[in-house]
UniProtKB/Swiss-Prot annotation:
Residues 803-893, 895-980, 983-1092 form the IPT/TIG domain. It is found in: Cell membrane. Cell surface receptor for SEMA4C, SEMA4D and SEMA4G that plays an important role in cell-cell signaling. Plays a role in glutamatergic synapse development and is required for SEMA4A-mediated excitatory synapse development. Binding to class 4 semaphorins promotes downstream activation of RHOA and phosphorylation of ERBB2 at 'Tyr-1248'. Also acts as a cell surface receptor for angiogenin (ANG); promoting ANG endocytosis and translocation to the cytoplasm or nucleus. One of its GO terms (molecular function) is transmembrane signaling receptor activity. The gene is PLXNB2. Monomer, and heterodimer with PLXNB1. Interacts with SEMA4C, SEMA4D and SEMA4G. Interacts with MET. Interacts with ARHGEF11 and ARHGEF12. May also interact with MST1R. The modification Phosphoserine is found at residues 1236, 1244, 1570. This is Plexin-B2. The record marks 1164-1165 as: Cleavage. GO terms for biological process: brain development; excitatory synapse assembly; homophilic cell adhesion via plasma membrane adhesion molecules; negative regulation of cell adhesion; neural tube closure; neuroblast proliferation; positive regulation of axonogenesis; positive regulation of neuron projection development. GO terms for cellular component: cell surface; extracellular exosome; plasma membrane; semaphorin receptor complex.
Length: 1838
């Protein structure tokens, strides 16, 4: 029976080892990116939606069906079906799966893709290749999902009610090319009137309003009872914030009356941390009494609390209660509720005023109640789980036995298993790595039986078990797993789920892992037992499972046979064993394992270690103390005095027994005196004894087994004992402790005689050391013997001799002193107090008593000396003087550092500096301290040169290097070290390496030239969830530092990847680049650097590959996972095998033509003389076998194959063929040469565009960050209107409307202001104003410029009543239209601004579109402007000719190759106290250009209008000790005849890294030559005798003499050469294309919100066309184009400074003009036929113009289809503008300026008013005369 049990135990251990092996997860890999996952609960089939594919897998992820869904011909702007003839922009487009849902009742699958505006299809669940429904020609009504890959779509298949229609509820964000529908309900079955996927009813959609600027990202959709819910994030722009919203609506509500949304917020338990912001995933489950919404939220690094994620819970009963409370508050609450409530997707809500109980009476809302409804008063939850530094990306929840388990996906590729406790806390109990550093996608789905979990990464889906209970072989491991699924099934002896344990419901039969402990023995009675006794052991077991009559327990004691146990309550009674193991040596007991087993199945229950003691062994545990050792242990042993033995206690003890724990009753000897005994001297030792009755009269002996002596003991009369020691000797130590034994007749009597033997001579070589010995030792210095001995061994003692100095350290010191001197020698005193004076080289040296060593060492601190000096050392020790010999001298000298190298390094430190100088080896290394601006530089090498490693600095710049010795700084000639910006890592490739390493990793960035030491470092931390495949082997954390780099320059470093452990997936690997003191993560936006397991290769069959003359084929797995064809190497013997193909499983290479010799030749075995085939990937090599060439030759002689008759014929044919081939080859080479040149040109342009665009996007990230931080510099309303209305006037920014200054004498000001207010009232009379305008327009001298200015004045004057202004404009416009219609030229209307009303329209549009510019269109316009500016300034710009290398304008193109180099200069702004600022410039920039770039960078956080002018600042360069002011022109300027070249940085030889100082100085303080400004602004320089140039001289003036003599042909050649540079236009255009497209889309995309003014005016134009029977679409198109795009957008595009606080340079303006012209061309319907003679600007955008034209057409069409804006809505909108901005305008000044026109045409106006009947009735002429009298201070005739 025992053997059976041990076999079972062994099998259990083997099972345990097997279970520790890592479970290989089932997975499926897709060739394309995966998007969605769904699982059929009934069949277990898994469905995957991917890019261009659908997959149908079985439950174990084996492929059953695969269907291709793309790519297909499509364009987001085109309406399906797509025809290439109709959609010219169509191209092959990927189909991203946007929606994948199951409809099990109808056995069908719903799938929607991003192709064709997001249309959907129905497929059969049993076979996805069978498509049940698909229609791409139904138009907008069938557009369901988003066609933007970045906009999420969620959905839910359900029914409208019991027995109702099957419908699809859809939520999606509003993408740039979407139809604007946010939420919709779609049919899934055809009806008589509707197709599948059409809206359920006409009202079953919600569409974003035309003014909506919010964007949504939907996260989840679910249903609860009669309701459907959506979870989504919304990015609000006013105010800018991110919100997570929960929306609810009734399933049976076809009109969306019940739609209600409210905020969800997930708070951090830390009240100081910011709330979590964006919801990343959500799931609903019912763990207990009710359903709960589980949602994971993220928080970015900019928030307080740092980056991280949290899990929040929202019980749905609380959600419903809150939503009902919100509905009731809106329906029946006060009007003030509108602050809490709003109308989703734009609009206002009218709450309040409804009967109490409306919410209950109409649970799904009603038409008469407010809808849709949004509430800012939402639900808040506190995170039950937080994780810092990573995002939780997926969540799903399961319930097991009323316990809630959450499975969470992470951004680094793990699945976290979390137990959610009932009290609202959480506990993470497991973490499974599915794919390292791969984001787990949102679809995390449980199988139908809830036994498996499906998780999805980018291209893989995994099946994970929800629990692994059976992998825990013992109850302890099961309990320690803390897995809520698991518990210990007692009757089966294994870890199981509760449902798998047959008697789980019985008491203590299933022990849950998180609450109950394992079955254990808590106590035993008796607690121990003698090995010589027999009896019963009663074990208390808890928890003891309830046992039935059939259950029988067995006891198994050690190796004894098992026997039945008795069970009494919780006690189990076992019999003691018949045989007990031998007691181990040195112990007094042996522990025997008691095992309790269940007989049925021999199931192990628990075990207990039971001790059996042995008293005979107990007496020998303590040396020389047999009795005390016996009775003092924990057992019940007793000492028998008669027999001198230890035995078990008896119930009735006899006399002569020392009982247990009565050790004081033992006979014993103690108290020796003396306690110390000198060596080599006989010593009398006395000691005492007690309890000696049993040894009286016996012979006693004392001795030691260690020193092998035994002496007799004599008893003194006083009752004490004595013995005399022999001369004992032991030279190994100074002292030797002895425990002496006492024996009586050979038996040990307990002895506590502990003495110490000591040796005076040991370690005391001189007198001072001897005197310093312990006084108890009584050591004395014996002069005659010159040694230290016991005092009794020396006849005469002598005093100590004088001190002896043998050496000093160090031998040199600085003049400043302060360093420690160590004096070594002998007889240097007995104690620190003996040292009375120390002198070093004649200078006092302060004694350091704490560092003193008796007799051998004195340490002191030297004081300063005035001059260098060398001298000896003197020490006064207790009145005795010791001097150093002549060869021991100390020198004072002055160390002097002279230079340091290198002179710059990274801000993070770690640079090794070498300091050169004289006497730097003064003192010792510990005396030297090097600092840089107070930060220590750790000294690592001391000698003639010092080396130290810099520490990190808080700031960058030049730091003074200071060296001090002994705390005193030494003279410094001004040695500086410059801290530069830490190196920046921008990219790296390749992205991964095999674990064996050795792959070349190219890291690119900036600033690498500063670095001395590079290393690629890998930090490997074992994953907790990983279990090693070998038992007894655990994974240890480690740090792997790679070998040095193999190449580096300033922008590139090449490493060889270091080797990491063989199983990289078992570790969390962090890869760093170590650059001196700076560490940077090897990670970019594309992801982190990865390690993958090494590939595996199959060895050649039989070890030899034969007949390999052409190709060698090797097989393996994962061959190309981290290796490319170019990197892989293969060898045949010693020669290379040329790589041809490398795939995941195959490698092909071409061997050398002749079989090479093997690398390692074997002598005997001919097989081994064949060359080896070696594959080398990085650092690792695989020898796959040997190769044998095919060396067979033909058996037929060559003379028979080629007889002599055939040879001449062959020669003739060959010559003919050769001649023909030669001709063909020559023609082919010419063709290939031309083709190669064309391809090279095309490739160079493409590469340049790609590189420039990449660089621009990187640079623009900083600009975008500035935009996000400081906002777009939009001008305030007044400045905007001033610039739009009046900046183009003749006075420009000096115009009185901009300055606001009225030249009116103060005494007259009140009268004038009162009169102007009356004039304002007069202007508010429509009759007066119409007459006024007509009269002015009839005046011949009233020019077009005057009309424009007059209209702008009128706009400001009437701004307070914009609805009245609009009415006037409306009236005048109708008159204008009538004129053009009568003249039969309606197309010409609005072409120019030749009338007052046309300018009024321009101003009206400018006013109404200000807010739209500020909120929407401004950002892409500003980014376009900044992108052009950055691109232009990236290359040379000729400051004189205003031409640039990078431009869109061919006339502004710099037609020459100018050599230039980018520089980064450090700029210090004087008197502003800021750190040096790095600024990027070009060495060919003029000083004014440099100033502008510096000002642009330094003051980037301030408005441009607050920047200093370039001519108001001075730029100073300090290359050394001198300073030089930089200016455009000075005495050093280069002259060539009459030409003078503008100075550049190259002229001054300013280099990269130079420091420039910018200071604001008055003109009078500037040197005369520095007061010059840009050449274009100096009139004197434009004179004939003083011409200036910058980069290129004008081609017609380079050399007039040559020009006159040159031929026409030479001039043509010059022009042709200039045309070569036109390719730059393509490069710049390609770089800026994305920004141009973004601007056009923001202005013309119909999906964007359209300002109401545009809709209102376009409808007005449509009405007028219809009224006048104008059916020509071209005419209406021209009207709309002339009224908005050309009248407003072109003006803003060409003049960004009208809306932004920016300065527009001429070269930027030139490129803006080209884009503006393209915009104008896009708005015309006429086709432009292009030819070679077409302007370059037209040719540049010839490809895109058709797209832009289509955008304009769609824009006009989309506006026409929008909901009409009523007059009332428009007037309300205008009134809001008036109310918000009128007070800021110079209305009074405008009235005054308007009156000037009245004054000028006074008589004509009076006559017109008197002739008009309406004006006569209102006495308008009289009122004007009164105003004139007041304003002109004259008496009228009235």
């Amino acid at each position: 029976m025992a053997l059976q049990l041990w076999a079972l135990t062994l099998l259990g251990l083997l099972g345990a080892g097997a279970s520790l092996r890592p479970r290989k997860l089932d997975f499926f890999r897709s060739e394309k990116e995966l998007n969605h996952l769904a699982v059929d609960e009934a069949s277990g089939v898994v469905y995957l939606g991917a890019v261009n594919a659908l997959y149908q897998l079985d439950a174990k992820l084996q492929l059953e069906q695969q269907v291709a869904t793309g790519p297909a011909l499509d364009n987001k702007k085109c309406t399906p079906p797509i025809e290439a003839s109709q959609c010219h922009e169509a191209e092959m487009t990927d189909n991203v799966n946007q929606l994948l849902l199951l409809d099990p009742p109808r056995k069908r699958l719903v799938e929607c893709g991003s192709l064709f505006k997001g249309i959907c299809a129905l497929r059969a669940l049993s076979n996805i290749s069978l498509r049940l429904f698909y229609e791409d020609g139904s138009g907008e009504k069938s557009f369901v999902a988003s066609n933007d890959e970045g906009v999420a779509t969620v959905g839910l298949v359900s029914s409208t009610g019991p027995g109702g229609d099957r419908v699809l509820f859809v939520g999606k964000g509003n993408g740039p090319h979407d139809n604007g529908i946010i939420v919709s309900t779609r049919l899934l079955d055809r009806t008589d009137s509707r197709e599948a996927f059409e809206a359920y009813t006409d009202h079953a959609t919600y569409k974003a309003g035309y003014l909506s600027t919010n964007t949504q990202q939907f996260v989840a959709a679910f249903e609860d009872g009669p309701y459907v819910f959506f979870v989504f994030n919304q990015q609000d722009k006013h105010p800018a914030r991110n919100r997570t919203l929960l929306a609810r609506m009734c399933r049976e509500d076809p009109n969306y009356y019940s739609y209600l949304e409210m905020d969800l917020q997930c708070r951090d338990p830390d009240i100081h941390a910011a709330a979590f912001g964006t919801c990343l995933a959500a799931s609903v489950a019912a763990p207990g009494s009710g359903r709960v919404l589980y949602a994971v939220f993220s928080r970015d690094s900019r928030s307080s609390g740092g980056p991280g994620a949290g899990l929040c819970l929202f019980p749905l009963d609380k959600v419903h209660a809150k939503m009902e409370a919100n509905r009731n508050a809106c329906y029946t609450g006060t009007r003030e509720a509108r602050d809490i409530f709003y109308k989703p997707f734009h609009g206002d809500i009218q709450c309040g005023g409804h009967a109490p109980g409306s919410s209950k009476s109409f649970p799904c809302g009603s038409e008469h109640l407010p809808y849709p409804l949004g509430s800012r008063d939402g639900l808040r939850g506190t995170a039950v789980l937080q994780r810092g530094g990573l995002n939780l990306t997926a969540v799903t929840v399961a319930a097991e036995n009323n316990h809630t388990v959450a499975f969470l996906g992470t951004s680094d590729g793990r699945i976290l298993k979390v137990y959610l406790t009932p009290d609202g806390t959480s506990s993470e109990y497991d973490s499974i790595l599915v794919e390292i550093n791969k984001r787990v996608k949102r679809d995390l789905v449980l199988s139908g039986d809830l036994g498996s979990l499906y998780a999805m990464t980018q291209d893989k889906v995994f099946r994970l078990p929800v629990q692994e209970c059976l992998s825990y072989p013992t109850c302890t491991q099961c309990r320690d797993s803390q897995d809520p699924y698991c518990g210990w099934c007692v009757v089966e002896g294994r870890c199981t789920r509760k449902a798998e344990c047959p008697r789980a419901e019985e008491a203590s039969h299933w022990l849950w892992s998180r609450s109950k402990s394992c079955v254990a023995v808590t106590s035993a009675q008796p607690q121990n037992m003698s090995r010589r006794a027999q009896g019963e052991v009663q074990l208390t077991v808890s928890p003891l499972p309830a046992l039935s009559e059939e259950d029988e327990l067995l006891c198994l004691f050690g190796e004894s046979p098992p026997h039945p146990a008795r069970v009494e309550g919780e006690a189990v009674i076992c019999n003691s064993p018949s045989s007990i193991p031998v007691t181990p040596p040195g112990q007094d007991h042996v522990a025997v394992t008691i095992q309790l087993l269940l007989r049925r199945g021999n199931i192990f229950l628990t075990s207990y270690q039971y001790p059996f003691y042995d008293c005979r062994q107990a007496m020998s545990l303590e040396e020389n103390l047999p009795c005390i050792s016996c009775v003092s242990n924990r057992w019940t042993c007793q000492w028998d005095l008669r027999y001198h033995e230890c035995r078990e206690a008896s119930p009735n003890p006899e006399d002569g027994i020392v009982r247990a724990h009565m050790e004081d009753s033992c006979p014993q000897f103690l108290g020796p005196s003396p306690l110390v005994i000198p060596m080599n001297h006989e010593t009398d030792v006395n000691f005492q004894g007690k309890n000696l009755d049993t040894v009286k009269g016996s012979s006693l002996h004392v001795g030691s087994d260690l020193l092998k002596f035994m002496e007799p003991v004599t008893m003194q009369e006083s009752g004490t004992f004595a013995f005399r020691t022999p001369k004992l000797s032991h030279d190994a130590n100074e002292t030797l402790p002895l425990h002496l034994y006492v024996k009586s007749y050979g038996k040990n009597i307990d002895s506590k005689l502990h003495v110490t033997l000591y040796n005076c001579s040991f370690g005391r070589s001189d007198c001072s050391l001897c005197r310093a010995a312990n006084p108890d030792y009584r050591c004395a210095w014996c002069g005659g013997q010159s040694r230290c001995v016991y005092e009794a061994l020396c006849n005469t003692t002598s005093e100590c001799p004088p001190p002896v100095i043998t050496r000093i350290q160090p031998e040199t010191g600085p003049l400043g002193g302060g360093i420690r001197i160590t004096i070594l020698g002998s007889n240097l005193g007995v104690q620190a107090g003996d040292i009375q004076r120390i002198s070093v080289a004649g200078r006092n040296c302060s004694f350091q008593p704490e560092r003193y060593s008796v007799s051998t060492r004195i340490v002191c601190v030297i004081e300063a000396a005035e001059t260098p000096f060398t001298g000896g050392v003197e020490v006064d020790v207790f009145g005795k003087l010791g001097r150093s010999p002549p060869n021991v001298q100390f020198t004072f000298q002055q160390p002097k550092p002279l230079s340091v190298e290198p002179q710059q390094g990274p801000q993070a430190g770690g640079t090794t500096l070498t300091i050169h100088g004289t006497h730097l080896d003064t003192g010792s290394q510990e005396d030297v301290r090097v600092t840089l601006n107070g930060v220590p530089c750790k000294v690592t090498k001391f000698g003639a040169q010092l080396q130290c490693v810099t520490g990190p600095q808080a700031t960058r710049g030049q730091m003074l290097l200071e060296v001090s010795y002994g705390g005193s700084p030494v003279p410094n000639p001004g040695i500086f070290f410059t801290y530069r910006e830490n190196p920046v890592l921008r990219a790296f490739e390749p992205l991964r390496s095999f674990a064996s390493g050795g792959r070349s990793i190219n890291v690119t960035g900036q600033g690498f030239s500063l670095i001395q030491r590079f290393a690629m470092v890998v930090i490997a931390e074992p994953l907790q969830s990983w279990q090693p495949p070998r038992e007894a082997e655990s994974l240890q954390p480690m740090t792997v530092v790679g070998t040095d780099y193999v190449f580096h320059n300033d922008t590139k470093v090449v490493f060889l990847s270091p080797a990491v452990p063989e199983e990289p997936e078992a570790y969390n690997l962090t890869v760093l680049i170590e650059m001196d003191g700076h560490r940077a993560l090897l990670r970019t936006e594309a992801g982190a650097f990865e390690y993958v397991p090494d590939p595996t290769f199959e060895n050649f069959t039989g070890g030899v590959k034969k007949q390999v003359n052409k190709l060698i084929h090797a097989r393996g797995t994962n061959l190309n996972k981290a290796m490319t064809l170019q990197e892989a190497e293969a060898f045949v013997g010693a020669e290379r095998c040329t790589m041809k193909t490398l795939t995941e499983t195959d490698l092909y290479c071409e061997p050398p033509e002749v079989q090479p010799p093997p690398k390692r030749r074997q002598k005997r075995d001919t097989t081994h003389n064949l060359p080896e085939f070696i594959v080398k990937f990085g650092s690792r090599e695989w020898v796959l076998g040997r190769v044998e060439y095919d060396t067979r030759v033909s058996d037929v002689p060559l003379s028979l194959i080629l007889p002599l008759v055939i040879v001449p014929m062959v020669v003739v044919i060959a010559v003919s063929v050769y001649c023909y081939w030669r001709k063909s080859q020559q023609a082919e080479r010419e063709y290939e040469k031309i083709k190669s040149q064309l391809e090279g040109l095309e490739e160079s342009v493409r590469d340049r565009c790609k590189k420039e665009f990449t660089d621009l996007m990187i640079e623009m990230e900083d600009q975008t960050n500035d935009v996000h931080e400081a906002g777009i510099p939009v001008l305030d309303y007044k400045t905007y209107t001033d610039r739009v209305f009046f900046l183009p006037s003749k006075d420009g920014d000096k115009d009185v409307m901009i300055t606001g200054k009225l030249d009116i004498p103060e005494p007259r000001r009140p009268v004038v202001e009162q009169a102007l207010y009356q004039f304002s009232n007069l202007l508010n009379s429509k009759s007066f104003l119409i007459n006024f305008i007509h009269t002015l327009e009839n005046q011949r001298e009233f020019s077009a410029r005057a009309k424009v200015y007059f209209a702008s004045l009128l706009t400001v004057a009437l701004h307070g009543k914009l609805e009245y202004y609009t009415d006037i404009m409306h009236t005048l416009f109708l008159e204008l239209l009538e004129q053009y219609v009568v003249a039969k030229n309606p197309k010409l209307m609005l072409r120019r601004s030749e009338t007052v009303v046309e300018r009024m329209l321009s101003n009206w549009m400018s006013i109404c579109l200000y807010q739209y510019l500020k909120d929407s269109a401004g950002e892409p316009l500003y980014k376009l402007f900044k992108a052009i500016k950055h691109q232009v300034e990236k290359g040379p710009v000729d400051a004189v000719q205003k031409k640039a290398k990078y431009t869109l304008n061919d006339t502004g193109l710099l037609g020459d190759d100018v050599e230039y180099a980018p520089l980064t200069v450090s700029v210090i702004v004087q008197d502003e106290g800021v750190d040096a600022i790095p600024v990027k410039v070009l060495n060919c920039d003029t000083i004014s250009q440099v100033k502008e770039k510096i000002i642009d960078q330094v003051y980037r956080g301030q408005p441009c209008s607050c920047w200093p002018r370039p001519d108001s600042v001075v730029l100073e360069w300090r290359p050394g000790s001198t300073a030089q002011i930089l200016s455009d022109l000075d005495l050093t300027s280069q002259r060539e005849g009459r030409w003078k070249r503008v100075n550049t940085l190259m002229h001054y030889n300013v280099r990269d890294g130079a420091t420039l100082i910018l200071s604001k100085v008055g003109v009078s303080q500037q040197p005369e030559d520095s007061q010059q400004d840009l050449p274009g602004e100096r009139h004197a320089l434009l004179e004939e005798e003083n011409r200036v140039w910058h980069l290129v001289r004008p081609t017609d003036e380079v050399d007039e003499g040559k020009s006159k003599r040159g031929s026409v042909k030479e001039k043509e050649r010059t022009k042709a050469i200039t045309e070569i540079y036109l390719t730059r236009l393509l490069s710049v255009k390609g770089t800026l294309q994305q920004f141009v497209d973004n601007f056009f889309q923001s202005v013309l995309a119909p999906g964007h919100a359209v300002p109401p003014a545009v809709k209102y005016f376009f409808d007005f134009l449509d009405e007028q066309a219809e009224k006048h029977n104008i059916q020509d679409e071209d005419t209406i198109h021209i009207w709309k184009t002339n009224s908005l795009p050309l009248r407003f957008w072109v003006n803003i595009l060409k003049n960004p400074h009208f809306i932004f606080d920016v300065h527009v340079h001429e070269v930027v303006d030139a490129s803006l003009s080209v884009i503006a012209q393209t915009f104008m061309d896009a708005c015309t319907r006429t086709e432009h036929k292009l030819s070679r003679d077409s302007p370059s600007n037209k040719l540049l955008y010839a490809k895109e113009i058709s797209t832009y034209k289509k955008m304009v057409e769609d824009y006009y069409k989309g506006i026409r289809q929008m909901v009409q804006v009523s007059d009332q809505d428009m007037n309300t909108h205008l009134a809001e503008i008036s109310r918000a901005h009128t007070d800021s305008l110079n209305t009074l000044v405008a009235l005054h300026q308007l009156y000037q026109y009245t004054q000028k045409y006074y008589d004509e106006i009076i006559n017109a008013l008197e002739e008009d009947p309406a004006a006569q009735k209102m006495q308008l002429a009289f009122r004007l005369q009164q105003i004139a009298a007041a304003l002109e201070n004259k008496v009228t005739d009235l």
